[in-house]
Amino acid sequence: LTCVTGKSIGGISTEECAAGQKRCFKKWTKMGPKLYDVSRGCTATCPKADEYGCVKCCNIDK
């Protein structure tokens, strides 16, 4: 499985997931008005969102 770890003007960066990590995730955490910290990567289980964030998981490549 290959997951996106970042997006920028230059394109996307990806990572090959380790054995046992069969899901990709994208997590947003609100830092301020219209300002979010976004993290992406591989995971074994979908992480939980905190009160200021949102998480989306999938089990497909990129």
From Swiss-Prot:
Subcellular location(s) per record: Secreted
Main location: secreted
Cysteine disulfide links: 3-24, 17-42, 46-57
The keyword Disulfide bond is annotated on this UniProt entry: yes
A Pfam cross-reference name: Toxin_cobra-type
Tissue specificity annotation: Expressed by the venom gland.
InterPro entries linked to this entry: Snake_3FTx, Snake_toxin-like_sf, Snake_toxin_con_site, Toxin_cobra-type
GO molecular function (one): toxin activity
An example Gene Ontology CC term for this record: extracellular region
Keywords: Disulfide bond, Secreted, Toxin
Family recorded in the similarity comment: Belongs to the three-finger toxin family. Short-chain subfamily. Aminergic toxin sub-subfamily.
Purpose: This protein shows a synergetic toxic effect in that it enhances the toxicity of other toxins.
Subunit structure: Heterodimer of C8S2 chain 1 and chain 2 (AC P01411); disulfide-linked.
Protein name: Synergistic-type venom protein C8S2, chain 1
Organism listed in the record: Dendroaspis angusticeps (Eastern green mamba)
Source species taxonomy: Eukaryota, Metazoa, Chordata, Craniata, Vertebrata
